[in-house]
Design a protein with these regions (language model features):
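Phosphopantetheine-dependent thiolation modules in NRPS/PKS and related acyl-activating systems
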Residues: 2-31, 41-42, 48-86
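Conserved ATP-binding motifs of the histidine kinase catalytic
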Residues: 34
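Two-component histidine kinase catalytic core, primarily the HATPase_c
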Residues: 37
Length: 86
């Protein structure tokens, strides 16, 4: 399973949204994610991948694709920093 698919599954589970509704070009509002759902998703991502996602980062996400790109970037940054400190 790709990282994008893992994240879509996680969003679906945490926000109780049908996977079929989760298109990367859909806005978070169109998907039906409210602030509580977003916090649940962020906590789940932080727990699963060991990354930190700040409020300022989230303010820049308008679509599911934006959110997935942000999470992927955070995961990649964490992996690079761990590799650099090894």
């Amino acid at each position: 399973m790709s990282l994008e698919q893992e994240l879509i599954e996680l969003v679906s589970k945490e926000a109780l949204v049908d996977v079929e509704k989760l298109k990367t070009d859909a806005t978070l509002e169109e998907i039906g994610l409210d602030s509580v759902d977003l916090v649940s998703v962020v906590f789940a991502v932080e727990d699963k991948y060991g990354v930190t996602i700040g409020e300022n980062d989230l303010e820049k996400t308008a679509t599911l694709g934006d959110m997935l790109a942000l999470i992927t970037k955070k995961i990649d940054e964490k992996a690079a920093s761990e590799k650099g400190s090894a």
